[in-house]
């Protein structure tokens, strides 16, 4: 069935609905993972809404979303989100998209030019 515990859902620039669960958010901001993301949740949403994506070659269900920001801490300049695409069955027995964030982090990406 469709997962519960959704924190929020956004639509990417390609028309896909993507959600983040409370469990995944807790994982992302845990001290051993990416606690620096905690105050940048809106940036994560923006990266999903406006960022470019790339399909992972070894797992075609996995996409990497990336979007630049000029006011991130230290020397990083992008927010990256990993999203798994799939399907689920809703309460009416219909197939529905099930696309969710697995993790997110900052990254420095050299810009061309």
Indicate where each model-derived feature is located:
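Ribonuclease/tRNase effector modules and their secretory precursors
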Residues: 1-113
């Amino acid at each position: 069935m469709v997962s519960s515990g959704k924190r929020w859902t956004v639509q990417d620039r390609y028309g896909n609905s993507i959600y983040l669960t409370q469990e995944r958010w807790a994982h992302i901001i845990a001290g051993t993972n990416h606690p620096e993301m905690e105050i940048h949740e809106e940036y994560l949403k923006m990266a999903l809404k406006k960022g470019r994506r790339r399909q992972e070659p070894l797992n075609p269900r996995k996409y990497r979303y990336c979007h630049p920001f000029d006011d991130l801490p230290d020397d990083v300049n992008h927010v990256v989100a990993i999203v798994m695409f799939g399907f689920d069955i809703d309460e009416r027995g219909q197939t529905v998209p099930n696309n969710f964030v697995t993790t997110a982090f900052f990254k420095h990406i050299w810009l061309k030019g």
